[in-house]
């Protein structure tokens, strides 16, 4: 059923009902704080790399290392989460990055922090981040129940947009005023606190026997099922294009802010927060039921709208115009992000959701390949032209995918 065909829902009371559930509230808050710290580290590591090397490629490599594990391990994380207690996976995904942040903060305090330390830390923490969609976000849907799954995921998506706004803002300020030592001390403390909060969560789960040899077959089974559903194929295809060609601009935020617009790390953090601010506003309208459109149209249209915003941003010579356009583009990513999760949960059978969502994580994991491509282009063309080339290519591919799968 399309969103336009659904009966009217009183979204505000449903959201209040969700927040009144202790288990949902805990999962929601843990996701909010942990993801804010992840985005903080992503900005801080990119700015650190660019200030040391003055190379856009070096900055994008460091950022990409945080995201590459989604491509390498995302589908396996989805399969494993059906056989291993998801609460345990979530706890490890908090504790291990907290330990990494503690080590990096200690190295910064003693004056021994090197770029390779940050790069390695990003890869280790990113490996744990690759479990997010198939574990914590699935648990959010399970706790909410099938009758509240759409507002629950919408609320979680709005919150994720807020963390992508707050994280870079905090990152820019922390880097400018506290340095790497203060930034990583903050992220370590928050992630240890989140792990403590999740420890007492009661989350019953029926698990299958873990058979590592079976995992490739599970993934193949998920892909075989996806080929029979044009909507799931659309989610996979547009997710790949959007992450590889649109969200790759995130790796160029430090070169754009510091190099192209010649602003401070704090204002670079504000530029990074522009799109998430728009996504937060747009997601709130969706969560409260004010925007009700066909889910596929919202998903594809939101992606295309954001790519148009990137093209305009790349052509802008004004920092504040770029900020405003990226903010508007965030309304597009709100539709894309909300419907990405909602379409997977409504189109996939319950026994295959983790596997199919694990494949979504792999699709998201193509983002760092785009980040690396954008970095290489930036070294030759400059950050503005790199964003322009990636945005235009992504827009063409999105339109082509939508037209092709509409005929199926």
Question: Language-model segments: which ranges?
Answer:
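Flexible cytoplasmic inter-helical loops of multi-pass small-molecule transporters
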Residues: 3-12, 199-224
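Paired intracellular helix-loop junctions of major facilitator superfamily
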Residues: 141-149, 346-353
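C-terminal transmembrane bundle of multi-pass solute transporters/carriers
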Residues: 72-76, 87-96, 103, 116, ...
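Core transmembrane helices of Major Facilitator Superfamily
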Residues: 124-136, 329-340
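Hydrophobic alpha-helical transmembrane segments
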Residues: 115-126, 151-205, 249, 271-273, ...
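Transmembrane alpha-helix termini and helix-breaking/packing motifs in multi-pass membrane transporters
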Residues: 46-52, 105-110, 166-186, 259-260, ...
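Helix-loop boundary and gating motifs at the non-cytosolic
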Residues: 10-69, 228-275
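Short hydrophobic/alpha-helical segments at membrane-entry points of transmembrane helices
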Residues: 27, 113-120, 235, 320-326
């Amino acid at each position: 059923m399309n969103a336009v065909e659904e009966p009217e829902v009183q979204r505000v009371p449903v959201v209040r009902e969700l927040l009144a559930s202790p288990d949902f509230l805990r999962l929601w808050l843990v996701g909010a704080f942990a993801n804010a710290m992840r985005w903080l580290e992503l900005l801080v590591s990119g700015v650190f790399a660019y200030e040391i090397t003055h190379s856009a490629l070096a900055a994008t490599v460091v950022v990409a290392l945080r995201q590459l594990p989604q491509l390498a391990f995302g589908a396996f994380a989805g399969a494993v989460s059906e056989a291993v207690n998801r609460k345990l996976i979530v706890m490890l995904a908090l504790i291990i990055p907290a330990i990494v942040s503690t080590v990096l903060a200690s190295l910064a305090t003693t004056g021994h922090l090197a770029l390779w330390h940050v790069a390695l830390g990003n890869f280790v923490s990113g490996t744990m981040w690759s479990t997010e969609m198939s574990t914590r976000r699935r648990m959010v849907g399970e706790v909410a129940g099938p009758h509240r799954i759409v507002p629950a995921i919408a609320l979680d998506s709005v919150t994720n947009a807020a963390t992508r706004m707050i994280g870079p803002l905090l990152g820019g300020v922390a880097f400018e005023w506290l340095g790497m030592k203060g930034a990583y001390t903050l992220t370590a403390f928050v992630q240890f606190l989140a792990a403590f909060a999740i420890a007492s969560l009661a989350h019953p789960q029926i698990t299958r026997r873990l058979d590592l040899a079976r995992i490739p077959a599970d993934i193949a089974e998920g892909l075989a099922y996806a080929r029979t559903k044009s909507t799931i194929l659309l989610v996979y295809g547009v997710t790949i294009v959007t992450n590889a060609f649109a969200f790759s601009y995130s790796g160029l935020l430090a070169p754009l802010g510091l190099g192209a617009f010649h602003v401070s790390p704090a204002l670079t953090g504000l530029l990074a927060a522009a799109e998430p601010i728009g996504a937060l506003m747009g997601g709130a309208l969706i969560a409260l039921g004010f925007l009700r459109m066909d889910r596929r149209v919202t998903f594809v249209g939101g992606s295309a709208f954001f790519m148009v915003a990137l093209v305009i941003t790349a052509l802008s010579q004004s920092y504040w115009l770029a900020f405003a356009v990226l903010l508007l583009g965030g309304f597009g990513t709100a539709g894309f992000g909300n419907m990405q999760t909602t379409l997977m949960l409504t189109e996939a059978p319950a026994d295959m959701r983790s596997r199919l969502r694990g494949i979504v994580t792999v699709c998201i994991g193509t983002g760092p390949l785009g980040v690396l491509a954008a970095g290489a282009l930036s070294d030759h063309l400059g950050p503005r032209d790199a964003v322009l080339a990636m945005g235009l290519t992504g827009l063409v591919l999105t339109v082509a995918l939508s037209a092709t799968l509409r005929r199926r």
